[in-house]
Amino acid sequence: MKDNILSALKEKISRQNWESWFLDFNVKKIEDKHVVFEVGNIFIKDRLEQKFSKIISKVVKESLGKDATFEIVYKEIDITQENEEKGPLVRKRPLLITPLNPKYTFENFVVGNFNRFAYNVFLEASKKPGYYNPIFLYSGVGLGKTHLAQALGNFLLENDPDLKVAYLTSEDFMNEMFYAIKNGTTEEFREKYRKKADILIIDDIQFLIGIKSAQVELFHTFNAIHEAGKQIIICSDRTPQELKDFHSRMISRFQMGLLVKIENPTKEDLFKIGKKISKLKGVEINDEIIDYISSIYDNPRLIHGAILKLIAYKNLYGSLNLSIAQSILTNPSKPPKALEEKLIEILSDIFECSPEEILSSKRTKNISYARKVGMYYAAKKLNLSTRDVGKVFNKSHSSVVQNISQVEKLIKEGNIIIKNYLKQIDKATKNFAQGESI
């Protein structure tokens, strides 16, 4: 009977749809007049229920009677269990073509109704890279696209360090292309992504709007990677159709795979995100404050920034209540100036150099020290991510990581000069924070 049902269903489904959605579709069991179908993942389950439920129901009723029913189940993936079963292994060093932020993982991604579908798609793609290809992920600003995309890259590297993952923004791609053209290294640039990359993740694709030369280069890169069966992830703040001035052939490439949307989160979703962030940072912020934050901000990125600002205050003073939180976040007479923005001015005073010099590429001793110590302080005391530290200091991610590492080494060696500088910064920052909270 199982084979009969599948054969009857196959006759009613086009070849293209069958090969796209039904290759892992099986009859798990038949109980009385109820058929349980099984598929490989929740993504396929959702698609089958949305697009083919009427056809499946018709075949089941024709085979078992008018009162016959069916359901579709999927094999769940348990990342934790799988990692435990593998046990401790000696890992090779990942072969990163471009850096990933190790803080972006599936485990610390807060899942709600607004992003559950996107989360499940990326989780499944991590198990079968290249199976859903390309994946075009879009949403409003600050809803978790970058987190999901990098979580996929980190997961793949964790399970196969030999993979070569390339993560970059479209602006990075464009700048690297122009640099290659200027320096006569175009072939090396093309080989880096077309031949060496196993996974290509392009973030903020909308920044290539109107840049025809970069679009052409990306088109050929896309084709080379896709034809090799390697995974491509495209992230955008809009749908492919809304990418105005993009060449139609590029848009058609984006549409040939999965279009995945992250919806707008509810207040309940934002509250969960706030709780998760404070937990991950190891700082307890009471529910009353988090509830307030989730009522005034409408996306996870703003929630994250608000939580970090309050954590910085709590680390400095040891206490935090709703009144103080409201003052820090919504002072109407004096917009709160983030500590990280003030940090450059503090460094300028302590190291006797201008803010412009700190943000420049100059490497004189006092400027270099100001930059290194400032990056360390921003990351360790103000809880900024290395990516955000890079934005504050106008430096690349790799440069930030290197400078922080150098300061950590000096501290471990007992360098008194560095420790004194950190104390001065700490004192100045506390004075500034006190002024902001009044």
From Swiss-Prot:
InterPro entries: AAA+_ATPase, Chromosome_initiator_DnaA, Chromosome_initiator_DnaA-like, DnaA_C, DnaA_dom, DnaA_N_dom, DnaA_N_sf, P-loop_NTPase. Residues 68-98 are annotated as: Domain II. GO terms for biological process: DNA replication initiation; regulation of DNA replication. Keywords: ATP-binding, Cytoplasm, DNA replication, DNA-binding, Lipid-binding, Nucleotide-binding. Residues 315-438 are annotated as: Domain IV, binds dsDNA. It is found in: Cytoplasm. Residues 99-314 are annotated as: Domain III, AAA+ region. GO terms for cellular component: cytoplasm; plasma membrane. This is Chromosomal replication initiator protein DnaA. The lineage of its organism: Bacteria, Thermotogati, Thermotogota, Thermotogae, Thermotogales. The gene is dnaA.
